[in-house]
UniProtKB/Swiss-Prot annotation:
Protein family per UniProt: Belongs to the GTP cyclohydrolase I family. QueF type 1 subfamily.
Protein name (record): NADPH-dependent 7-cyano-7-deazaguanine reductase
Family matches, as InterPro entries: GTP-CH-I_C/QueF (IPR043133), NADPH_dep_7-cyano-7-deazaG_red (IPR050084), QueF (IPR029500), QueF_type1 (IPR016856)
Stated role: Catalyzes the NADPH-dependent reduction of 7-cyano-7-deazaguanine (preQ0) to 7-aminomethyl-7-deazaguanine (preQ1).
GO BP: any one term: queuosine biosynthetic process
Organism: Anaeromyxobacter sp. (strain Fw109-5)
Length: 122
């Protein structure tokens, strides 16, 4: 497995696909670049999902998130891209991606992207 930034999300079989359960992850060191100013933007990315047949492998997720560090992108775009890419990789029953960005210009931005319907009782 690579040890440098990569957009390739690795997956593995869900060990309990018949049981709806939630997986939650947090990356407090996410960085991208403001496409307007060229300055770095810092965020905590929070993922919560209910897997179907596949799960996201953690090291590949770290390297995937790391791959945005030099990319110019708006908060809204990158949060939705992360959600879309994970949906493409694992087709979860439900997913929520929250981009909680550090204050910039006196404004604190939180972007939430969701896909699917959260199963009842999870």
């Amino acid at each position: 497995m690579p040890t440098k930034p990569a957009r390739d999300l690795q997956t593995f079989p869900n060990p309990k696909p018949d049981r709806p359960y939630e997986i939650a992850m947090e990356c407090p060191e996410f960085t991208c670049v403001c496409p307007v100013t060229g300055q770095p933007d810092f965020a905590t990315i929070r993922l919560r999902y209910v897997p179907a047949e596949r799960c996201v492998e953690l090291k590949s997720l770290k390297l995937y998130l790391w791959s945005f560090r030099d990319e110019g992108t708006f908060h809204e775009a990158v949060t939705n891209r992360i959600c879309d890419d994970i949906v493409q990789a694992i087709a979860p029953r439900w997913i929520e991606v929250v981009g909680d960005f550090a204050v910039r210009g006196g404004i604190h931005t939180v972007v939430t992207a969701r896909h699917g319907e959260r199963p009842a009782g999870v």
